[in-house]
């Protein structure tokens, strides 16, 4: 009901014409007022313990209004990667996704890759306790709004090889 009342086509067009290309208040409302961003996460992180079904329901509702909210990038892809990885980074970032304070942009596509997920030329070289990433990404949806970038980079293997690709969560500031 919230989306139907908030996201009529004319309002969507106005949001897209704003300098930031969206209304940040809607994302905050989805997370804080309605609590929807907590649905697919474990109770230990402040979630409701849902999963794929809850994500599918939400994606369907967002699709009905052609929403421009970063649900897929932040909750499904970013949150899913964090859930799978676990650990301190997940413990710190998932609650920020749930509260609406974190928006994740998934930086995976590269100009030469033509959406082949294994065609990654971006490299990650260990440097002390961290990594230095070097390369180019293209079409990173939600990047202008993101607090974090989830970047694919190669730590080993050749450019089109499936092995040797890792994901790095990087603060966007």
Feature-to-residue mapping (PLM):
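Amphipathic, small/basic residue-rich leader segments at the start of a protein or domain
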Residues: 1-72, 92, 96
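Buried hydrophobic positions in well-ordered alpha/beta secondary-structure cores of metabolic enzymes
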Residues: 3, 35, 42, 58, ...
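Short, solvent-exposed loop/turn elements at beta->coil junctions and helix N-caps
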Residues: 44, 109-113, 138-139
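N-terminal glycine-rich flavin-associated loop
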Residues: 67-88
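Active-site-adjacent elements of ketosynthase-type condensing enzymes
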Residues: 112-120
């Amino acid at each position: 009901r919230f989306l139907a009342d908030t996201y009529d086509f004319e309002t969507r067009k106005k949001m897209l014409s704003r300098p930031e290309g969206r209304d940040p208040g809607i994302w905050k409302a989805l997370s804080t007022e309605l609590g929807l961003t907590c649905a697919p996460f474990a109770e230990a992180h402040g979630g409701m313990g849902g999963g794929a079904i809850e994500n599918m329901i939400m994606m369907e509702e967002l699709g009905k209004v052609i929403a421009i909210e970063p649900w897929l990038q932040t909750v499904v892809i970013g949150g899913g990667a964090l859930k799978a990885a676990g650990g301190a980074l997940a413990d710190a970032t998932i609650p920020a996704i749930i509260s609406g304070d974190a928006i994740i942009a998934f930086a995976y596509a590269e100009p030469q890759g033509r959406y082949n997920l294994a065609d990654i030329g971006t490299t990650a070289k260990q440097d002390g306790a961290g990594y230095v990433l070097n390369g180019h990404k293209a079409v990173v949806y939600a990047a202008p709004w993101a607090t974090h970038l989830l970047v694919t980079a190669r730590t080993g293997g050749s450019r089109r090889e499936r092995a040797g690709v890792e994901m790095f969560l990087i603060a966007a500031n």
